[in-house]
Amino acid sequence: MSKSRLTVFSFVRRFLLRLMVVLAVFWGGGIALFSVAPVPFSAVMVERQVSAWLHGNFRYVAHSDWVSMDQISPWMGLAVIAAEDQKFPEHWGFDVASIEKALAHNERNENRIRGASTISQQTAKNLFLWDGRSWVRKGLEAGLTLGIETVWSKKRILTVYLNIAEFGDGVFGVEAAAQRYFHKPASKLTRSEAALLAAVLPNPLRFKVSSPSGYVRSRQAWILRQMYQLGGEPFMQQHQLD
């Protein structure tokens, strides 16, 4: 290998190492800060806003209103747990059984990829990372998930998740969603309304709260049944999530 190529390789290696250190400090600081402070915006919100501007859509506004857990209907927290991650109170960020099932399904159905991300993983991804699928992003997501599971309580993870989740075009967080779709604060959401909001979370840009498809309605009904089977509001109290 020539001296010039060695020099370039050495420069790139030093640059990447420094970048990793900077990102680690940035993300570590974010995890520490947002363990107590409201989250003003997420990486997904920034990505959506910048993408809209780049496409000439200057009317798009990524909107979110932070609210504490006691300003959110307990039905909403229960609905997303029932829909997205029923083992949320028990695991340390990863549902191994669900991951194994998803991998087996994806091997059989390459055109219909199934995910197995927990609420903790989705929170880490939405807050700190870019959208998309890659092993690099998945690796970073795993590290960030362990970080927030170590520093934050389960109640804090759920609070942040509900405040940054995307519920529609430009609609981020349960307070903005409740105001947009039901003209009421998040604290007043009913069990059925909470289940409908949770029903669009797999793909909120495809599935619409304002005009729910038959699939969304059937998923809403399934979520309502799961909420009942989990035990209703006492489930949230039992796990200190309310």
From Swiss-Prot:
**InterPro entries (alphabetical):** Glyco_trans_51, Lysozyme-like_dom_sf, PBP_transglycosylase, Pep_trsgly
Q: How does it sit in the membrane?
A: Single-pass membrane protein
How is this protein's function tied to pH? Optimum pH is 6.0-6.5.
Report a single Gene Ontology molecular function.
Answer: peptidoglycan glycosyltransferase activity
Q: Name one GO cellular component term.
A: peptidoglycan-based cell wall
Cited NCBIfam families: mono_pep_trsgly (TIGR02070)
UniProt xrefs under SUPFAM superfamilies: Lysozyme-like
Keywords of this entry: Cell inner membrane, Cell membrane, Cell shape, Cell wall biogenesis/degradation, Glycosyltransferase, Membrane, Peptidoglycan synthesis, Transferase, Transmembrane, Transmembrane helix
> Which domain of life does this protein belong to?
Bacteria
> Any idea what this protein is called?
Biosynthetic peptidoglycan transglycosylase
> What is the uppermost EC class here?
transferase
Species for this entry = Escherichia coli (strain K12)
Pfam families reported in the protein's UniProt record: Transgly (PF00912)
Family to which this protein belongs: Belongs to the glycosyltransferase 51 family.
Transmembrane region positions? Answer: 19-39
Subunit architecture = Interacts with FtsI, FtsW and FtsN.
Known regulation of its activity is: Inhibited by EDTA. Stimulated by Ca(2+), Mn(2+) and Co(2+). Not inhibited by flavomycin.
Listed under catalytic activity are:
[GlcNAc-(1->4)-Mur2Ac(oyl-L-Ala-gamma-D-Glu-L-Lys-D-Ala-D-Ala)](n)-di-trans,octa-cis-undecaprenyl diphosphate + beta-D-GlcNAc-(1->4)-Mur2Ac(oyl-L-Ala-gamma-D-Glu-L-Lys-D-Ala-D-Ala)-di-trans,octa-cis-undecaprenyl diphosphate = [GlcNAc-(1->4)-Mur2Ac(oyl-L-Ala-gamma-D-Glu-L-Lys-D-Ala-D-Ala)](n+1)-di-trans,octa-cis-undecaprenyl diphosphate + di-trans,octa-cis-undecaprenyl diphosphate + H(+)
Q: What does this protein do?
A: Peptidoglycan polymerase that catalyzes glycan chain elongation from lipid-linked precursors. May play a role in peptidoglycan assembly during cell division in collaboration with other cell division proteins.
Q: Any idea where this protein resides?
A: Cell inner membrane
> Tell me, which GO biological process terms does this entry list?
cell wall organization; Gram-negative-bacterium-type cell wall biogenesis; peptidoglycan biosynthetic process; regulation of cell shape
E.C. number(s) listed in UniProt: 2.4.99.28
Cite the annotated pathway: Cell wall biogenesis; peptidoglycan biosynthesis
